Curated annotation (Swiss-Prot):
<feature type="binding site">
    <location>
        <position position="250"/>
    </location>
    <ligand>
        <name>1D-myo-inositol hexakisphosphate</name>
    </ligand>
</feature>
<feature type="modified residue" description="Phosphotyrosine">
    <location>
        <position position="47"/>
    </location>
</feature>
<feature type="binding site">
    <location>
        <position position="326"/>
    </location>
    <ligand>
        <name>1D-myo-inositol hexakisphosphate</name>
    </ligand>
</feature>
<dbReference type="GO" id="GO:0031410">
    <property type="term" value="C:cytoplasmic vesicle"/>
</dbReference>
<dbReference type="GO" id="GO:0015031">
    <property type="term" value="P:protein transport"/>
</dbReference>
<dbReference type="InterPro" id="IPR014753">
    <property type="entry name" value="Arrestin_N"/>
</dbReference>
<feature type="binding site">
    <location>
        <position position="324"/>
    </location>
    <ligand>
        <name>1D-myo-inositol hexakisphosphate</name>
    </ligand>
</feature>
<feature type="region of interest" description="Disordered">
    <location>
        <begin position="353"/>
        <end position="375"/>
    </location>
</feature>
<dbReference type="GO" id="GO:0008277">
    <property type="term" value="P:regulation of G protein-coupled receptor signaling pathway"/>
</dbReference>
<feature type="region of interest" description="Interaction with TRAF6">
    <location>
        <begin position="318"/>
        <end position="418"/>
    </location>
</feature>
<dbReference type="InterPro" id="IPR014756">
    <property type="entry name" value="Ig_E-set"/>
</dbReference>
<dbReference type="GO" id="GO:0006511">
    <property type="term" value="P:ubiquitin-dependent protein catabolic process"/>
</dbReference>
<keyword id="KW-0805">Transcription regulation</keyword>
<comment type="function">
    <text>Functions in regulating agonist-mediated G-protein coupled receptor (GPCR) signaling by mediating both receptor desensitization and resensitization processes. During homologous desensitization, beta-arrestins bind to the GPRK-phosphorylated receptor and sterically preclude its coupling to the cognate G-protein; the binding appears to require additional receptor determinants exposed only in the active receptor conformation.</text>
</comment>
<feature type="region of interest" description="Interaction with CHRM2">
    <location>
        <begin position="45"/>
        <end position="86"/>
    </location>
</feature>
<keyword id="KW-0963">Cytoplasm</keyword>
<dbReference type="GO" id="GO:0005905">
    <property type="term" value="C:clathrin-coated pit"/>
</dbReference>
Length: 418
């Protein structure tokens, strides 16, 4: 075929009897609605016999290690489960075919069974909590899984060899309209000083993209008789774990400590630049990351955009960011300044990916720069312009092969250990 095509991801069951086809692996949350999960499952009719084809979509919050499961208690909570009987189609599950499903059924034949899921917009985005250096197995966090299998009923126990499991992601992109420019100020009156110290800080904008430097403008008016010895700037990630009770964890992801002095009765103004990178935070256990799929690297978790009136109990992990500016003031005076000598302000901001440009119906198929398995991409040989690509993400250079993502692992970070 030519060098243009529509990419479709596929994954087959270990026994080779079922294959699921999806048009994408990332599904965008537009706040008021989420991209539908539409695809087809191709079934070997001799294997199907008199059974039915089921597809399930599960959103789960894994918050502990499987090896800690005792007495039937599991460290996992299913936030959302939906089931579709793909074949024979149940009347309540029958929906109009999407353009992708029409093309796939035309190409794959009559044994391709369509399925469609609607993800509620109030569900959390895919977030992974970074494991520690010694941790193995599945990481804690929120993930979405599509599972297809043949059975006489939904309650039938299915072996992994006879099913297809695909981990997909629910993602959000930065809004087109940024919020107001973050600014904050505070005034501190010190003992034995007639006049106060004033700190004002601002960011150059409200939305930053991953990998983009953050400019922090700091202005200090020191009318006291004390000296500002240091100025500490930090970017902090806050993760609200919404499970049984809401707990908040904070972690610095970029820091600068400047020995900039502000003498008594003087002013100071300077712009500091910090860039939060995951590469500089690889050892921080429990740091929130964007949901990670097999063979693909990720980044710091994006800020969570919430709908008004959203139920926080099913939001899983809510991520936010703040820049903290802290002045370290020299202690002095007869009483040694019993009150705290630090003066600080916080500046909330949004850290996200920009919304990608809409892809045209036909697109160039790029040559991969990273090594892939020889069977990773299969090109069809007829006139249709569909490119089938294995669902597994391309392997990163230097990354060892993982076990299949469905394997039960041990050693994930436990929330209580953060």
């Amino acid at each position: 075929m030519g060098d243009k095509g529509t990419r479709v991801f596929k994954k087959a069951s270990p026994n080779g009897k079922l294959t699921v086809y999806l048009g994408k692996r990332d599904f965008v949350d537009h706040i008021d609605l989420v991209d539908p999960v539409d695809g087809v499952v191709l079934v070997d009719p001799e294997y199907l016999k008199e059974r039915r084809v089921y597809v399930t979509l599960t959103c789960a919050f894994r918050y502990g290690r499987e090896d800690l499961d005792v007495l039937g208690l599991t460290f996992r909570k299913d936030l959302f489960v939906a089931n579709v009987q793909s074949f024979p189609p149940a009347p309540e599950d029958k929906k109009p075919l999407t353009r992708l499903q029409e093309r796939l059924i035309k190409k794959l034949g009559e044994h391709a069974c369509p399925f469609t899921f609607e993800i509620p917009p109030n569900l959390p985005c895919s977030v992974t909590l970074q494991p520690g250096p010694e941790d193995t197995g599945k990481a804690c966090g929120v993930d979405y899984e599509v599972k297809a299998f043949c059975a006489e009923n939904l309650e039938e126990k299915i072996h992994k060899r006879n099913s297809v499991r695909l981990v997909i992601r629910k993602v959000q992109y930065a809004p087109e309209r940024p919020g107001p420019q973050p600014t904050a100020e505070t005034t501190r009156q010190f003992l034995m000083s007639d006049k106060p110290l004033h700190l004002e800080a601002s960011l150059d904008k409200e939305i930053y993209y991953h990998g983009e430097p953050i400019s922090v403008n700091v202005h200090v008016t020191n009318n006291t008789n004390k000296t500002v010895k240091k100025i500490k700037i930090s970017v902090r990630q806050y993760a609200d774990i919404c499970l049984f009770n809401t707990a908040q964890y904070k972690c610095p992801v970029a820091m600068e400590e400047a020995d900039d002095n502000v003498a008594p009765s003087s002013t100071f103004c300077k712009v500091y630049t910090l860039t939060p990178f995951l590469a500089n935070n690889r050892e921080k256990r429990g740091l929130a990351l964007d949901g990670k799929l097999k063979h693909e690297d990720t980044n710091l978790a994006s800020s969570t955009l919430l709908r008004e009136g959203a139920n926080r109990e099913i939001l899983g992990i809510i991520v936010s960011y703040k820049v903290k500016v802290k002045l370290v003031v020299s202690r002095g005076g007869l009483l040694g300044d019993l009150a705290s000598s630090d003066v600080a302000v916080e500046l909330p901001f949004t850290l996200m990916h920009p919304k990608p440009k809409e892809e045209p119906p036909h697109r160039e198929v790029p040559e991969s720069e990273t090594p892939v398995d020889t069977n990773l991409i299969e090109l069809d040989t007829n006139d249709d312009d569909i490119v089938f690509e294995d669902f597994a993400r391309q392997r990163l250079k230097g990354m060892k092969d993982d076990k299949d993502e469905e394997d039960d692992g041990t050693g994930s970070p436990h929330l209580n250990n953060r």
